[in-house]
Swiss-Prot record:
One of its GO terms (molecular function) is protein-macromolecule adaptor activity. Residues 200-313 are annotated as: Disordered. The lineage of its organism: Eukaryota, Metazoa, Chordata, Craniata, Vertebrata. This is Ubiquitin-like protein 7. It comes from Mus musculus. Gene3D superfamilies: DNA helicase RuvA subunit, C-terminal domain (1.10.8.10), Phosphatidylinositol 3-kinase Catalytic Subunit, Chain A, domain 1 (3.10.20.90). The gene is Ubl7. The modification Phosphoserine is found at S230. One of its GO terms (cellular component) is cytoplasm. It holds the Pfam family ubiquitin. Residues 333-377 form the UBA domain. Keywords: Immunity, Innate immunity, Phosphoprotein, Ubl conjugation pathway. Deubiquitinated by OTUD4 which stabilizes UBL7 expression. Residues 206-221, 239-253, 270-293 have a biased composition (Low complexity).
Length: 380
């Protein structure tokens, strides 16, 4: 076979419906060697040159052939790549573009800071709720996601993670310094006020911000409530907590939600109640209550059965119980739900459907993340 017959088909892993691109390997680069002597790193450069819009940098891709991730220092011969073979391109996580902080309305910010500063110094329950939120990794991550520019401001991140610094920077007198230098921190502090205000009563009611209904906070840019931050928050003001049947379905920002129509559906409250009941009932291994019998009693929390039984609920126990609850609710088979992704993984040479399903389940059906998980050996 002449060198001019050497070509490869290239397909982007995250665009399964896109046609393959034909990559003709240049003869002049081969010299005395056969095409099989090409290194994988050189092949990446050729692909980046061919697909400039989709692959701007060869360092940001991995190549997959017959279910194997190709190493840069190996050759085509090493992996048995022949003319006409299809190589799949897996794009690595792209670096996040720099986000500019949202502009700060200084007048509104001053009003919010005064409310927060007063509440921090006059209400121990409010102060504890604020610091509990900031010490919780998940809630802090949500604040970072909801506040453009915050992730690239190390000083602002340090302030949010230190109680003393937060108390100092939440002073209205600091605004003149913060607005030009750390606008993202100002927006984050205001977001903290809105978030905690939805779950902990503000001291006094003379401020328009304090008397504002909690539902209106969700309508503000970047605003969301941490209603489900921690069960321990019930210790502050139990009378102000809403019952599970009337609570807002989601307290996470939209950017943290599920992506893609093929991802898993959200867990319903009845399924969560069933899981909690299963996890806290000793007989749960032999009996699976139906979701229709859980979480609908008036004025009764689905946590009550777990509290009364005194059985400690571990993460593993809860995960197993949640699986039982989802199965009892008639959740479609994962193999049917993610059939297109499974077929795509098979096309790449990954024939272990059980491994693929676990990876897809862990990544919410994201094919690219599932591939990275499989090749990293991290599929559960």
């Amino acid at each position: 076979m002449s060198l001019s017959d050497w070509h490869l088909a290239v397909k982007l892993a995250d665009q399964p419906l896109a046609p393959k691109s034909i990559l003709q390997l240049p003869e002049t680069e081969l010299g005395e060697y056969s095409l099989g002597g090409y290194s994988i790193s050189f092949l990446k450069q050729l692909i980046a040159g061919k697909l400039q819009e989709s692959v701007p940098d060869p360092e940001l891709i991995d190549l997959i052939y017959c279910g194997r991730k190709l190493k840069d220092d190996q050759t085509l011969d090493f992996y048995g790549i022949q003319p006409g073979s299809t190589v799949h391109v897996l794009r690595k996580s792209w670096p996040e573009p720099d986000q500019k902080p949202e502009p700060v309305d200084k007048v509104a910010a001053l009003r919010e800071f005064r409310v927060l500063h007063t509440a921090l110094h006059s209400s121990s329950s409010y102060r504890e709720a604020v610091f509990k939120m900031l010490s919780n990794k998940e809630s802090l991550d949500q604040i970072i996601v909801a506040t453009p520019g915050l992730s690239s401001d190390p000083i602002a991140l340090g302030v949010l993670q230190d109680k003393d610094l937060f108390s100092v920077f939440a002073d209205p007198n600091m605004l003149d310094t913060l607005v030009p230098a750390h606008p993202a921190l100002v927006n984050a502090i205001i977001l903290v006020l809105h978030s905690v205000a939805g779950s902990t009563p503000m001291p006094g009611a003379d401020s328009s911000s304090r008397s504002m209904p909690s539902s209106s906070y969700r309508d503000m840019p970047g605003g969301f409530l941490f209603d489900g931050l921690s069960d321990d928050e019930d210790d502050f003001h139990p009378s102000t907590r809403s019952t599970p049947s009337s609570s807002t379905p989601s307290s996470r920002p939209a950017s943290l939600g599920y992506s893609g129509a093929a991802g898993p559906r959200p867990i319903t409250q009845s399924e969560l109640a069933t899981a909690l009941a299963l996890a806290s009932t000793p007989e749960s291994s032999s009996h699976t209550p139906t979701p229709g019998t859980q979480g609908h009693s008036s004025g009764t929390s689905p946590m009550s059965s777990g509290v009364q039984s005194g059985t400690p609920i571990t993460n593993d126990l809860f995960s197993q119980a949640l699986q039982h609850a989802l199965q009892a609710s008639g959740q479609p088979s994962l193999q049917i739900q993610w059939q297109p992704q499974l077929q795509q993984l098979r096309d790449m040479g990954i024939q272990d459907d059980e491994l693929s399903l676990r990876a897809l389940q862990a990544t919410g059906g994201d094919i690219q993340a599932a591939l990275e998980l499989i090749f990293a050996g991290g599929a559960p």
